Amino acid sequence: YFRVGYTLSKALDDGPDALVVGRSGNVQNSYDANAERGFSADDQRHRFTAAWVAEPRKFELSQSWLNGLVNHWKLSSIVTFGSGRRLNATIAGDPNQDGNTYNDRLTNSRNAFTGTDYFSTDLRLTRNLKLSDRVKLDLLIESFNVTNRTNKRVEISDDGFFNSAGQFVAYSTNPVGMNGKYYPGQYQVNETFLEPTNAYAPRQIQIALRLNF
């Protein structure tokens, strides 16, 4: 069989999922919680998946050993493509002097930036062995990301839920100071702003046995 799925979505919220453990719920301005409304950390605009299974018909050959060799095979695959996930850019430090560091933004909204896309193909080859009328054994060899595509991500926590997205925007090396405080403040973009610093898993291969009874 062959199945295809496509999702076009847009997710907005005013904070991380309540089930995400260890994620800060601090807002930039405690007097204006509505300003936190923006793209959700798990917002992904496009997602495409295709799955197929190929199981050839049974061949009736003259030699029994040939029948056992060419029959009872199955090949299946899942192809996944997803557009980039959301990233949040903040300023290192505490420019609004509220005592809460690493949550202040410039003029951008929360999760205003987008990371790199994702593409992966998984492949499985299965051989079915009939041990008895009630017992069957499946021999499987599977490969995840079989094409070994380098799926980059901006930082290791960028997985759609655990998404802090790093402090991309830093203080200028020559800020305007007043009594030791930054006012009004000059900022510069880090050289690594939105540059991928990590990657999802490369090609992986595993062999398995599954007993059905």
How does the language model describe each region?
Residues 1-213:
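Short, solvent-exposed micro-motifs at the edges of structured domains
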